UniProtKB/Swiss-Prot annotation:
Highest classification ranks of the organism: Bacteria, Pseudomonadati, Thermodesulfobacteriota, Desulfobacteria, Desulfobacterales
Originating gene: der
Positions annotated to bind GTP 2: 180-187, 227-231, 292-295
Domain EngA-type G: 2-166, 174-349
UniProt entry keywords in alphabetical sequence: GTP-binding, Nucleotide-binding, Repeat, Ribosome biogenesis
Annotated protein name in UniProt: GTPase Der
Domain KH-like per the UniProt entry, residue ranges: 350-434
PANTHER family, per the entry: GTPASE DER
Function: GTPase that plays an essential role in the late steps of ribosome biogenesis.
Family to which this protein belongs: Belongs to the TRAFAC class TrmE-Era-EngA-EngB-Septin-like GTPase superfamily. EngA (Der) GTPase family.
Residues engaged in binding GTP 1: 8-15, 55-59, 118-121
Length: 445
């Protein structure tokens, strides 16, 4: 798919424009300069033409932010990848030395470049564009990322110059969320997979503030990778941008099929890791525990047993989640992650026939009779699978609210034993049904 890159100094409104074009809230928007540290990708469509948009970090040579060199590296990569570029100016602030710096980088490029004066909310404000004439660019376009003024006209021009879209990747690709506390190695892992520094990597926790979607192909198969900001415990989140990032990270979990829950093997599993694993379990996505930084572990046999025991004890609610050790730095076992992802996804999308389900349920009831409710035994009528991702099964019962969690756990474990679905969450729901209309499943006794 063709790519439009949005460039500009910090706080000129690139993220607001990005959200307007992509009709999303994907890029973080805030008044603080340098909010978009990383490149943020999303798809857009205008006049029937589909294309991708990248929102880059603010470009500023004298920015005191410690990540400025990394941001410049990211901007340069985005420039290389882009089929067209939109350079954004702040219509209310007028031209700045930073704008001239970026112009000096863009002018020599043999690519379509659109110069946008942002924050022009109406025709009456277009007089503000006169200040930018001194920059000597070919044509200035008034836009308002916040209100939409001028954006359709700009997009009309963009779709005319973009190359035709290449054959579309299959839509049903596996969506993978990479989650973990700050500095667990999430971005390093994705960079190792992609073979380039798509995401900012630094020793400072919280480097990746936003979530970035990236498509990669492994053995000819497409996967959608979602890297999220590190999730801190609520009490330790002070900066409002960090809070916004955490909300976005949790929303990313809602749309991923498989979550890679990254742990720091040199530290073992922490309370924070357990909280993050809990978020993944609540959203019922497939999960894989990755103990990263394995190259730094000395006594590997002892450490492996210790961390596996810790995971199984402290995150027992994810007892179905596979566990493996990796090194994002050296690439150790990184390729094997996708083999495991495929296995988890296959179970995550499994369908069980109604007849097989009811045989299993009948066997379970025979093996362990349902408990009593107000002096009468619970009656199970029948079960059916209503959806996948994860396998979701509805059991019709005379008193659904009376099914104890321990009996529910027994039924789920029985389904796992009979189907081999030992690496996916299973959602089991209970619904009311009139017993006179349905045959009651037999129980022993």
């Amino acid at each position: 798919m063709a790519l439009l890159a949005i460039m500009g100094r910090p706080n000129v409104g690139k993220s607001t424009l990005f959200n307007r074009i992509t009709k999303s809230r994907k890029a973080m928007v805030d008044d603080s300069p340098g909010v978009t540290r990383d490149r943020n990708y999303a798809d857009a469509e205008h006049d029937g033409v589909k294309f991708s948009v990248v929102d880059t970090g603010g470009f500023s040579k004298n920015d005191p932010d410690a990540f400025v060199d990394l941001i410049h590296f990211q901007v340069n990569q985005a420039i290389e990848e882009a089929d067209a570029i939109a350079m954004v100016f702040d219509g209310k602030d007028g031209p700045s030395p930073f704008d001239r710096d970026l112009l000096s980088v863009l002018r020599p490029l043999d690519k379509p470049i659109f110069y946008l004066v942002n924050k022009i909310d109406s025709l009456d404000m277009e007089y503000l564009m006169a200040d930018f004439a001194e920059l000597g660019v070919d044509k200035l376009h008034p836009v308002s990322g916040e209100h939409g003024y001028g954006v359709p006209t700009f997009l009309d021009m963009v779709v005319k110059v973009l190359p035709k879209a290449s054959p579309k990747l299959e839509e049903d690709m596996i969506s993978i969320g990479v989650v973990g506390r700050p500095n667990a190695g999430k971005s390093s892992l994705i960079n190792k997979i992609l073979g380039q520094e798509r995401l900012l990597v630094s020793d400072t926790p919280g480097t990746t503030r936003d979530a970035v979607d990236t498509v990669c192909q492994v053995n000819g198969k497409p996967y959608l990778l979602l890297d999220t900001a590190g999730i801190r415990r609520k009490g330790k989140v002070k900066h409002k941008l960090e809070k916004f990032s955490i909300v976005r990270a949790l929303k990313g979990l809602e749309r991923c099929d498989v979550a890679l829950v990254m742990l720091d093997a040199t530290e073992g599993i922490t309370d924070q890791d357990v909280h993050i694993a809990g978020y993944a379990e609540e959203r019922k996505c497939g999960c894989i525990f990755l103990a990263n930084k394995w190259d730094l572990v000395k006594d590997k046999d002892w450490a492996l047993k210790k961390i596996k025991d810790e995971v199984r004890m402290n995150a027992k609610f994810l007892n179905y989640a596979p566990f493996m050790t990796i090194s994002a730095l050296t690439g150790q076992r990184v390729n094997r992650i996708f083999e495991l992802v495929d296995k988890v996804y296959a179970q995550y999308t499994t369908r069980i026939s109604t007849s097989k389900l009811n045989r299993m349920l009948e066997n379970a009831i025979t093996r362990h009779e349902p408990p009593y409710h107000k002096g009468r035994r619970l009656k199970f009528y029948y079960a059916t699978q209503v959806s996948t991702k994860p396998p979701t099964i509805v059991c019709f019962v005379n008193h659904p609210d009376a099914v104890h969690f321990s009996y529910k756990r027994f039924l789920i474990n029985h389904i796992r034993e009979e189907t081999g679905l030992d690496q996916t969450p299973i959602r089991l729901l209970f619904r009311q049904r009139d017993r006179k209309d349905l045959k009651v499943l037999k129980s022993g006794g």
